Amino acid sequence: MASTFYIVQHEFKAGKAEKWWETAYAAMSPGGGWDDAVAVNREKGFFNHSANAVTKTGPVYCFWEVKEGISAEEFQEFIDGPSGPGFGQDVLMNICKPIDTSLMNGQTPYSPVFS
């Protein structure tokens, strides 16, 4: 069995979008810890291939890859937790949908990082 890919719909909770963007921009700035967080999450078996904001107030759609052996429940717990895209703040509602790659003859949305 291979990695599982998910599309995650992130909806901002009422009045929380601005706080999230401020936190995200700070994290992605030089010295903000973004690269370290990506490395730690990858080590845990979670990798975000892309984040795609529709508007500044949401939603944001992300493509995540999850290492083999990690359940959907464990992924949801990660996404909702302190290491997930909400930065440990109560700002996002995260709807995680696994992508059935068998429907597209095994094609994945991105080249897998876990083999």
Question: How would you label these PLM feature ranges?
Answer:
Residues D80-D90:
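A common structural junction motif
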Residues M1-P59, E65-E77, I95-S115:
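Short S/T/G/P-rich N-terminal loop/turn motif that feeds into the first structured element of a domain
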